[in-house]
């Protein structure tokens, strides 16, 4: 799960660079939406990964 969280975080950073940096003016609105979408997905997968990391089940 933490791998997916890291992937979504990287995608969010890339979307932010395009949306907030003015590189792609025509796609700025879409990039901003994608940034927040992937940022939310990053947080969700991060929480799922941290909660799912429990010790081995009792025998």
UniProtKB/Swiss-Prot annotation:
It is found in: Cell membrane. InterPro entries: DUF1328. It is a multi-pass membrane protein. The chain crosses the membrane at residues 5-25, 30-50. It comes from the Bacteria. Keywords: Cell membrane, Membrane, Transmembrane, Transmembrane helix. GO terms for cellular component: plasma membrane. It holds the Pfam family DUF1328. Belongs to the UPF0391 family. This is UPF0391 membrane protein lpp2589.
């Amino acid at each position: 799960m933490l791998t997916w969280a890291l992937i979504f975080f990287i995608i969010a950073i890339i979307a932010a660079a395009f949306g907030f940096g003015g590189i792609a003016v025509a796609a700025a609105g879409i990039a901003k939406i994608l940034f927040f979408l992937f940022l939310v997905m990053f947080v969700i997968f991060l929480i799922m990964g941290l909660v799912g990391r429990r010790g081995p089940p009792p025998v």
